[in-house]
Amino acid sequence: MNRNGRFGNLEIAASVKNLLKYLPGSYLQKFYRLPQKGNQHAKRFMLRFSCRPFRHLLIDVGIRAHLIPDSAYEDNYMEHLPRDGLCSKLKKHLNNARVTGINYYPGSKYFEIEFTHFYLAFDFYGVGNLILFQKPDNNLNSSDSIILETIED
């Protein structure tokens, strides 16, 4: 981990290896935006999957990604978090979506969770990005292939 607390290439590779152990075949159940303290550029999200014992994925976009054990967060705490536009959009497209794989490009600061019909990409360069891609089907119309949502304060 760098001095500023951001994941480097090795930490991302280790985190992806851990994700590959638990997430494939599980279902995304909930998507939360967690409240922020301090750093206004860090965006923190919690993804809850159906796999156990590590079913919570904590993502600080642009900073770090961790699988968290069930005991770390109480469900009743997360149920009272406010919903926002990004969470609603992701819930619309990824509600109960099955994880089919984790794609990682060695040496990069980028990985994506592959669902049945979408990719959820996490970029750890600079302030980071969270991008939802629709899987391309064999249609000629490519205008619907990317769904982008910007993360703003």
Task: List PLM regions with ranges.
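Acidic, proline/glycine-enriched N-terminal capping motif
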Residues: 1-153
